[in-house]
Amino acid sequence: CIADYFHFTDYYISGKDTLNLDYYVLSYNKQKALKHFQQVKPMLNCFEHYFGPYPFQNDGFSLIETPYLGMEHQSAIAYGNNYLPGYNGNKNFIAGLDFDYIIVHEAGHEWWGNSITTNDIADMWIHEGFCTYSEVLYVECIYGYQKMIEYIQNQKRFVRNDKPIVGPYGVNKKGSSDMYQKGSLMLHTLRNLLDNDELWFSLIKGISNDFKYKIVDGVDIINYITNKCNLNLDSFFDQYLHTSKIPLLEYKIQKEGREYVLLCRWDAINNFDMKLLVNNGKEDIWIFPESEWKEFTLGNFDIKNFSIRDDLFYIDTKKVN
């Protein structure tokens, strides 16, 4: 006998389809599980909204209690988060977020990792970056946009920037564990760089549907994104995927007459020219920094209200004299 498991079932309606939900929990956790797993159906609804239909309809969806935290086995997720919110009770210091991290993250892998799988573990950012970003979208779906911003900002403190998140190819070696949070932050940055949520969400769903049940390389996903966006994103992906640094915006502000002028430049890889939002306390303003100093007029405003929108873009900033 493996353990004294209690098995209970539920179902999730998706359009004209019915998805079987099976839960296997230790018998003494029956009442906890009956209540705790109620978050599964709203989560599946969010993920189907963003990524398309659950990819393993015939297999069903299962959670199986285990003595370890979790693993994304296809249609049979190992669950060991002790029926607690966050990561084994750690809510990551964001008030009001009470979801179970293991359920949400491992379920996200049904789309990112199980349905779409990388050819080489060097490109595991496709699994973990997109799946960690699925947590972000889940928060936006259930708790709203502002809580999503708080959640994505909190992910920054887990990034070490120790080495690139893409590993060497052909030698069975992963890149940095930053593939989780840094990968998510890269996608969040790309969403705001596009400045078009209709395009962004069609892009995410398009990747999920067009590469369903396929083995992919990182270049497949990057080419898909650049073609759909009709943008040259080579330097963007090179910076975030193939270096251990994030772009640094050096800047200074000067007053010319009644107006303030922003001088800035990127300290990043060659040809990095990502546009960026700043705010003068009245409105967001697009700027277009490059590697050389450029000047942007911000208008007449209270300088104390100036901010760089690093809540929307994963960058470092440095004010210089």
For each feature predicted by the language model, list its residue ranges.
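Hydrophobic helix-coil surface modules that form long, contiguous segments used
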Residues: 1-104
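Soluble non-cytosolic domains of exported or imported proteins
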Residues: 30-41, 93-94, 98, 102, ...
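Generic, well-ordered alpha-helical scaffold segments in large soluble proteins
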Residues: 39-50, 82, 102, 106, ...
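Zinc-dependent metallopeptidase catalytic helix centered on the HExxH motif
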Residues: 41, 46, 79-80, 85-149
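Amphipathic alpha-helical substructures
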Residues: 55, 176-256, 262
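Acidic/His/Gly-enriched intrinsically disordered linker/tail segments
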Residues: 124, 128-189, 193, 211
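Beta-strand-rich binding/interaction modules
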Residues: 233-234, 249, 253-310
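Short acidic/polar inter-strand loop motif in beta-rich domains
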Residues: 310-321
